[in-house]
Amino acid sequence: MQYPVDTHTHTVASSHAYSTIHDYLAVAKQKGVRLFATTDHGPAMADAPHFWHFVNLRVLPRMVDGVGILRGIEANIKNRDGEIDYFGDYLSQLDIVLAGFHEPVFAPSDKVTHTEAMINTIRSGKVDIITHPGNPAYPIDIEAVVTAAAQYGVALEINNSSFEVSRKGSEANCTAIAKAAKALGATLVMGSDSHVAFSLGGFDRALSIIDAVDYPKDKLLNRSPMALLDFLTLRGHQTVADFIPHFRDEAI
């Protein structure tokens, strides 16, 4: 089954990625992906796009040939206080805000520090999805993080790329996160973390985790465009109302 939503992609605006928006649209049409988010790295990363890149995402069309393009960012968690590298009114102009740990911005430390930073990010109200929380370089108190995510309505990502090209050793942590999410009622989302368009909508390894723990598919944000749009609306992103006329008649 091809899930029709991908919340985590990178373009050539992040110089270690290799595809354009046009490339992603072409692959989306081929694979049946109906809605994807462009989420290049936040400006604190050395090769990330300039701040203005995110401000000017407003020039992107909402829909192209039946495919929706969400304007987003994968921000960097900067410190123990859970601060990220994108701020103020500019956040309200984005459709979706992801954030996670990245070594060039937040050096790996200890479990207590990582847990506090992640929970403070969740509590901040600025971030919709925590990316690759199962990264073994950043051990966390899984139960505490998942409890906070459930309480504050923030989704946790099962990152497909973590099992294929980066963050080796993530499988055990991601399985534990998925089990805890099922038990505690937290929302999960699969992210391709695509750095080349061919990977768009690629969730095979992440889905194997979801299936292994029998996580309820009706809580998985990838299940339909409206599932994600309803989630983002509840998170306060009024901008996503632009998409609803295009998808509201589809099953959630």
UniProtKB/Swiss-Prot annotation:
The keyword Hydrolase applies. Zn(2+) 2 binds at residues 16, 41, 195. Zn(2+) 3 binds at residues 74, 102, 132. Its EC number is 3.1.3.-. Zn(2+) 1 binds at residues 8, 10, 74, 193. GO terms for cellular component: cytosol. Its cofactor is Zn(2+). Transmembrane segments: none annotated. SUPFAM superfamilies: PHP domain-like. This is Probable phosphatase SO_1652. It comes from Shewanella oneidensis (strain ATCC 700550 / JCM 31522 / CIP 106686 / LMG 19005 / NCIMB 14063 / MR-1).
